[in-house]
From Swiss-Prot:
The gene is RSRC2. This is Arginine/serine-rich coiled-coil protein 2. There is a cross-link at residue 376 (Glycyl lysine isopeptide (Lys-Gly) (interchain with G-Cter in SUMO2)). There is a cross-link at residue 376 (Glycyl lysine isopeptide (Lys-Gly) (interchain with G-Cter in SUMO1)). Residues 1-230 are annotated as: Disordered. The modification N-acetylalanine is found at residue 2. The keyword Coiled coil applies. The modification Phosphoserine is found at residues 4, 17, 30, 32, 104, 377. Belongs to the RSRC2 family. InterPro entries: SMAP_dom (IPR028124). It comes from Bos taurus.
């Protein structure tokens, strides 16, 4: 009986060991990818446990002390395995290797074959599963990204269609409103209330919509119809206004000029009739306002009348009467007349007659002298009919001029080494002969 108890006790912990080993394998797989490297050691631990079962069945004849020691050893191994699996996986593998060395002497060849088969199976299964999982996750991500891009495209196209439909509906509403307003203006009062209510409702709806649409609606006003025609009409109206203003200004200027001319005529008439004081009095009596300009014009007109009475010369109308002194202007006009009037026949003086009758004894010399003095050649005919006294004087003059010329030529020949003789009226040889 005692032996049977010991066998049961020995078998119980051994039966529980495969469950714990399965849990350990699951924890090792889920902990880290590094654990996948140690599939070989796990397969060894499984074969070890099976061999233990077979050994314990064959060792039923062993003593109770041996079973107690085994129990203690296994309980210690369990506690150490739990701690090691949670904290350090490397220590567990080292303890498994030690157990493998103890049991390696029993069935070496079978154990190696089983290990190789299981390790290859475990590795292949784990690697294929991880690859399948990765492939599935990647395909799912691709499908999700494709579906997202499709959703985005659909949402964009929908938003565009909505915008287009809204703009079309707005244009239709505007056309309908413009037509209704043009047709039914006399019914405006009855329909204005309903329109205002509907507009307020539309505004509320627009406010409830996203903000960007309301902004775009408020910022873009409805285009006015026939904008080009309005601009052309505006330009024509502006031109017409400018022409009207120019006409008005021209009329005002013409009126001012007419008034000034009238004032000047009045001032001239007043100056002709009497003094400036009387003229101003006459203007005051007539009812016209006397300005400083009118007073100055009256004074200048009085001065002009005075100069005209003294000299008989009037200042022309194209001169400014305020800028021209009438007395000085009269003196200048007298001088001009004296200069430009024609000479009379009986106004020759005695000196003029003497210079005209002057004779140098040479015709060429006489002609040159008369040209220089401005004496006309018509008087040559009158020179023949001269008195005896005048004839004597003319002869004396000729002799004097001849003697002077001869002396001058002699002096010139001596001092200037015959560079030139005389004034050019006579030859050098003739002067030398006379000497």
């Amino acid at each position: 009986m005692a032996a049977s108890d010991t066998e049961r006790d020995g078998l119980a912990p051994e039966k529980t060991s495969p469950d714990t080993d399965k849990k350990k394998e699951q924890s090792d797989v889920s902990v880290s990818p590094r654990a996948s490297k140690h599939h070989y050691s796990r397969s060894r631990s499984r074969s070890r446990e099976r061999k233990r079962k077979s050994d314990n069945e064959g060792r039923k004849h062993r003593s109770r002390s041996r079973s107690k020691e085994a129990r203690r050893h296994e309980s210690k191994d369990k506690s150490s395995k739990k701690h090691k699996s949670e904290e350090h996986n490397d220590k567990e593998h080292s303890s498994d290797k030690g157990r493998e060395r103890l049991n390696s002497s029993e069935n070496g060849e079978d154990r190696h074959k089983r290990k190789e088969r299981k390790s290859s199976r475990g590795r292949s299964h784990s690697r294929s599963r991880s690859r399948e999982r990765r492939h599935r996750s990647r395909s799912r991500e691709r499908k999700k990204s494709r579906s997202r891009s499709r959703d985005r495209k659909k949402s964009r196209s929908r938003s565009r269609e909505r915008k287009k439909s809204r703009s079309r509906s707005r244009e239709r509403k505007r056309r309908i409103r413009s037509r209704s307003r043009s047709r039914s203006r006399h019914r405006h009062r009855s329909r204005s209330r309903s329109r205002t209510r509907s507009r307020s409702r539309d505004r509320k709806k627009r406010i409830e919509k996203p903000r960007r649409f309301s902004r775009s609606l408020s910022r873009t006003p409805s285009p006015p119809p026939f904008r080009g025609r309005n601009t052309a009409m505006d330009a024509q109206e502006a031109l017409a206004r400018r022409l009207e203003r120019a006409k008005k200004l021209q009329e005002q200027r013409e009126k001012e000029m007419v008034e000034k001319q009238k004032q000047q005529e009045i001032a001239a008439a007043a100056a002709a009739t009497g003094g400036s004081v009387l003229n101003v009095a006459a203007l005051l009596a007539s009812g016209t306002q006397v300005t400083p300009q009118i007073a100055m014009a009256a004074q200048m007109a009085a001065l002009q009348a005075k100069a005209l009475a003294e000299t008989g010369i009037a200042v022309p109308s194209y001169y400014n009467p305020a800028a021209v002194n009438p007395m000085k202007f009269a003196e200048q006009e007298k001088k001009r007349k004296m200069l430009w009037q024609g000479k009379k026949e009986g106004d020759k003086s005695q000196s003029a007659e003497i210079w005209e009758k002057l004779n140098f004894g040479n015709k060429d010399q006489n002609v040159k002298f008369r040209k220089l003095m401005g004496i006309k050649s018509e008087d040559e005919a009158g020179c023949s009919s001269v008195d005896e006294e005048s004839y004597k004087t003319l002869k004396q003059q000729e002799e004097v001029f001849r003697n002077l010329d001869a002396q001058y030529e002699m002096a010139r020949s001596q001092t200037h080494t015959q560079r030139g003789m005389g004034l050019g009226f006579t030859s050098s040889m003739r002067g030398m002969d006379t000497v």
